[in-house]
Amino acid sequence: MRAKPLPPLAVSIGDPSGIGADVALAAWLKRCELSLPPFFLIADPKQLAARARHLGLAVDFAILSDPREAEAAFGERLPLLALKHSHTESPGKPLTENAAGVIEAIERAVELTLKGEAAAVVTCPIAKKPLYEAGFQHPGHTEFLAELAGHHLGKPVTPVMMLAGPQLRAVPVTIHIPLSEVPARLTTTEIVAVSRITANELRERFGIASPRLAISGLNPHAGEGGALGKEDDAIILPAIEQLIREGIDARGPLPADTMFHAPARATYDAAICMYHDQALIPAKALAFDETVNVTLGLPFIRTSPDHGTAFDIAGKGIARPDSLVAAMRLAQQLAENAASRNA
């Protein structure tokens, strides 16, 4: 059993022009109804207060000097750790000048979690274009978090993206690259590395004693013996054979079009897919509002809603907090599992 309660979750606000503020405010207002774990936002107080007024929400904020103050405040006021970089309130209109604050919020969340002052990092969505315009050089959240983790550990980190929902956990081997580049970038070594990390995290944080991995093919019908592509037999099959030699329960390559119906899903704990959409389409189709983006392979827990900034509905009061709520709940569950395992 745990010797002491977990600290609160650290929630970075994401792009302030998107729906991050909308869904974070909505989630806190439903904290009792949804039995949410304590969390604090890392955001610009003025921008967040302006969004609350814009949405007609009555929210009192508790400006924290220490994250440990969050739990006591959580029942009556929304705990908020103020950014040094201010944000301009501009619902639906991403601004390059907000980039520094977006990056700072992520860095602060990671720092506090690594120090043990937060149980996990929960990130609201960011927009890549304004960040790139400000000099950000990472394809997305996942790669930036890996760099921060690498600085902390003093060695490179391999981040693995998992989409986790109530009916499916799906992991893409390649992530944010054009589909045309996938065959050239796919390697046996990378498939083995991603699968190892997935199996380890399923044991360590998800509490699955003997994880079962279903590994997809790349081509239609998993290549059909080479008739529809060589990668399945030349690249993917050797990876599966290596995983089996290491004692990991892995099978495939499986045709992707028959992997995701209910009887197939019942036979594995995670699907290892070869590219972004092969993993994300079934995950989101099965449970769009309940699926959570989890980054595996980091020295801290990180979850995120599975939607983007949704600039077109920001500030309109129609954004649903379901996916953020699911991300918070999963982050808390993973933190509790890890704490129990280490107790």
Swiss-Prot record:
It catalyses: 4-(phosphooxy)-L-threonine + NAD(+) = 3-amino-2-oxopropyl phosphate + CO2 + NADH. Keywords: Cobalt, Cytoplasm, Magnesium, Metal-binding, NAD, NADP, Oxidoreductase, Pyridoxine biosynthesis, Zinc. The keyword Magnesium applies. Binds 1 divalent metal cation per subunit. Can use ions such as Zn(2+), Mg(2+) or Co(2+). A divalent metal cation binds at residues 176, 221, 276. Its EC number is 1.1.1.262. Its cofactor is Zn(2+); Mg(2+); Co(2+). It is found in: Cytoplasm. GO terms for molecular function: 4-hydroxythreonine-4-phosphate dehydrogenase activity; cobalt ion binding; magnesium ion binding; NAD binding; zinc ion binding. It is an enzyme of class 1 (oxidoreductase). Substrate binds at residues 141-142, 284, 293, 302. GO terms for cellular component: cytoplasm. It holds the Pfam family PdxA. The keyword Cytoplasm applies. GO terms for biological process: pyridoxal phosphate biosynthetic process; pyridoxine biosynthetic process. Pathway: Cofactor biosynthesis; pyridoxine 5'-phosphate biosynthesis; pyridoxine 5'-phosphate from D-erythrose 4-phosphate: step 4/5. InterPro entries: PdxA, PdxA_fam. Belongs to the PdxA family. Homodimer. The active site is located at the dimer interface. Catalyzes the NAD(P)-dependent oxidation of 4-(phosphooxy)-L-threonine (HTP) into 2-amino-3-oxo-4-(phosphooxy)butyric acid which spontaneously decarboxylates to form 3-amino-2-oxopropyl phosphate (AHAP). This is 4-hydroxythreonine-4-phosphate dehydrogenase. The gene is pdxA.
